[in-house]
Regions:
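RNase H-like, Mg2+-dependent phosphodiesterase core
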Residues: 1-213
Length: 213
């Protein structure tokens, strides 16, 4: 069973991202503030769930969360910042939305959005460049340890999958509905046949290894 909090009595938002490894598409991050003590045994690290399970849990998270936000950082911005900075920037964008700030490229909701705010951040991973004034704790494998991070991982993953399906319709032939932009043989073959799109991350060294420029 996942833990409901790190510090009892403190409002903690879970933060996670999806899309650090793909060759194409955005990185998407989510921040979720769950009701204190909320527990749902179905919630888990999104990577351990099937696509159907993730899609079923997304509206559950959105409905039960006091507040949630999902932020998107484009491939172009990833190339400018590098993927680590882009990922943590996306998390901070989502957190700022929970704090009531107006942030572009963010969708947010929750029945307490704007009326309650996080006091502490639980961040999946081991590195975080904090752009907020909130204290935080990085937690390796946090999406398999804490309920709020697991909820954030589900939102980040499902929103990014949606984005890749839309991009697949715009640029058919790369199989993005299936591979979600990750470095599969199908994706490499498509790049060699069709070239790069505006949604490809040109900074990723995998391209150079395949002499695609």
């Amino acid at each position: 069973m996942l833990a409901t909090s790190l510090h009892h009595g403190r409002r903690e938002a879970g933060c996670d991202e999806a899309g650090r490894g793909p060759l194409a598409g955005p990185v998407v991050a989510a921040a979720v503030l769950l009701p204190e003590g909320y527990n749902n045994e179905a919630l888990d690290d999104s990577k351990k769930l099937t696509e159907r399970q993730r899609e079923a849990l997304r509206p559950v998270v959105e409905a039960v969360a006091d507040a949630w936000a999902v932020a998107t950082v484009s491939a172009e911005e990833i190339d400018k910042r590098n993927i680590l900075h882009a990922s943590t920037h996306a998390m901070c964008m989502a957190v700022k939305a929970l704090l009531g700030e107006s942030v572009e490229d963010v969708v947010a909701g929750g029945h307490m959005l704007g009326r309650t705010h996080p006091e502490f951040l639980l961040v999946d991973g081991n590195r975080f460049y904090n752009e907020t004034n909130l204290p935080f704790q990085t937690i390796v494998g946090g999406d398999a340890k804490y309920m709020a991070i697991a909820a954030a991982s589900i939102l980040a993953k499902t929103y990014r999958d949606d984005a890749m399906r839309h991009l697949d319709a715009e640029y058919p032939g790369y199989g993005w509905s299936r591979n979600k932009g990750y470095p599969t043989a199908e994706h490499y073959d498509a790049i060699e046949r069709l070239g790069l799109t505006p949604y490809h991350r040109r900074s990723f060294t995998l391209y150079r290894q395949h002499t695609l420029f």
